[in-house]
């Protein structure tokens, strides 16, 4: 019996050792996991209670200081310190790149206003802006505009009041034009890449007055209308981007659109721009209650043929021709 018990104990010894060999690593893994995940859980709880960080340190202030240091480091790579709110100084090679990229994008994607905005500033050379400044300084209204530096916004213009003005006033015509075209004076992009603060304001003023040029000439914001107004601005103010737009933009239009522009609207725009008073000197905000016909006469602006009407008549004529063609085709086709 004793020998049998010894044999059984000897036989079960490897099995126990084997089990112990499995249990010990498992216990070690469990202990290690408890330490790791338990520590993470405690850290999470401490973070939630606000006990993790040093309470004597203002981490929000430190983050703000780090951001400020990064901004200063970036500013040190600029050719000059920003000279007005929103100013982004560019090196000469960056201005050339801005001109090349925005010019390319504007030609192939004229519907994207951001491209036009960048091209406008890239081509707004100091000599042009200084000439525009002298034009404003030579006129009493222009001098007041430079001194007061007004902004054209919906808040300043009081759109609700414009809607109630007599229908023959500039303010009502302007309000109706904005409503019909579904645009707002608040959507004009700020100037960023022009270095001189006064030049930057002059270009911003030109940009903000653009919709008044549309409204007083009853020109829609479709591509033909935009090219026409750009040609008007180029002839009247000498805006480089407007001159480029008047020359190059028609090349991408359909034949019938180019024909309308070359035969009617571009000649009108150049003739009117050269003969009318400098539009940059018009204090539009003070003209809102004035009779629009009298104002056109004062500025020497004549209305062009209504572009919307011409397009509708062209579409109706084409529809009529297509209907006649299809009718004749059905009549001559054997059943």
Curated annotation (Swiss-Prot):
It catalyses: 4-hydroxy-3-methoxy-5-(all-trans-hexaprenyl)benzoate + H(+) = 2-methoxy-6-(all-trans-hexaprenyl)phenol + CO2. Residues 1-10 form a transit peptide. Component of a multi-subunit COQ enzyme complex, composed of at least COQ3, COQ4, COQ5, COQ6, COQ7 and COQ9. Interacts with COQ3. Its EC number is 4.1.1.130. Pathway: Cofactor biosynthesis; ubiquinone biosynthesis. This is Ubiquinone biosynthesis protein COQ4, mitochondrial. GO terms for cellular component: extrinsic component of mitochondrial inner membrane. HAMAP family: Coq4 (MF_03111).
